[in-house]
């Protein structure tokens, strides 16, 4: 039986999502809890919609695992949350079709990047939003964002050492919303390359600060060269917000 779960986690104290020997990760904590439920010393593999890096958070990560246990779908959050640490929570669970895969069945993801622009750092926000105290021209950021919407080769906006050959992705929406204490970037697409969202966020913030123009961002995209684009924004402002699947 295949179980699909939507989970949330605070990425601050994790070394990313994926299992790493000797390090605390989201996947390792999930598999540890499942091993207890299954009363096994072996591994119960967990598959996610995608990896997240150290400090990156998730409000709507999706995972799946296979189990021989006849636990109803709606009971799995109770079983897992009783064993998981406080910085991971299973929000929902359901029995999925055998052909469902958390990663390969996904058709759209949404990320959000949070920035607070107060004059001085806030110790209570330092792990959950990026402090950017420079004046920002939000209109320029929105104008630059429009160049990135659509289907493009995003070589300039992914980590230079990525092993992925096909760097064409489609961004459906990319917008900036002003909040009480700063800004929120919302981006949806059919998939994202390694560090793609953080590089886009860093580049657009620097555009708002006057380092780049909207036309510069268009030229960065066309250059297909990581060195042409801006910096990578810190991980702690980034949230995997939701993952969508065909019914």
From Swiss-Prot:
Substrate binds at residue 111. The active site is at residue 53. Pfam families: PseudoU_synth_1. GO terms for biological process: tRNA pseudouridine synthesis. Coiled coil: none annotated. It catalyses: uridine(38/39/40) in tRNA = pseudouridine(38/39/40) in tRNA. It comes from the Bacteria. Formation of pseudouridine at positions 38, 39 and 40 in the anticodon stem and loop of transfer RNAs. NCBIfam families: hisT_truA. Homodimer. This is tRNA pseudouridine synthase A. It comes from Bacillus velezensis (strain DSM 23117 / BGSC 10A6 / LMG 26770 / FZB42) (Bacillus amyloliquefaciens subsp. plantarum).
